[in-house]
């Protein structure tokens, strides 16, 4: 979920060298202003093989932030979170769920801001990024679905909430709550609905 495009300030991209030409990054990407590349993936466990594949994809696609859901890591063991080229900024341990948020190793302006039961928020430069995972069996807090963040902000992840506005046939209670929250906060959903 993103704020309307007109409300994103023109500030320097936090991972960009001031002399780097963003227009020549690759053939299928054209930055028309500040750009931040975010990889989001529900990994359904964070095995060594998956960490290697994630590292390769992130390197090839020049990813700045990686947001993972369903890491299935319940022990606080650093080696189980290592992704080559990235620094772990925040994580939530859980045997069946879990989250992990990383930034590219050369980005120095990154900090953990806050965590709630369903999200971890980091700040990279002037951007706030919320890595969201709500297990299907749990419900949004009707009074406070997700934290409101200053613009520019991105809420990314696996929301496990369904609503016709997002391409689903019907809405569930969580979808109604999330859609109402996003509408009240003037947020737009950019999605690729699971097929």
What kind of region is each of these model predictions?
Residues 1-195:
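A shared catalytic/ligand-binding motif for oxyanion handling
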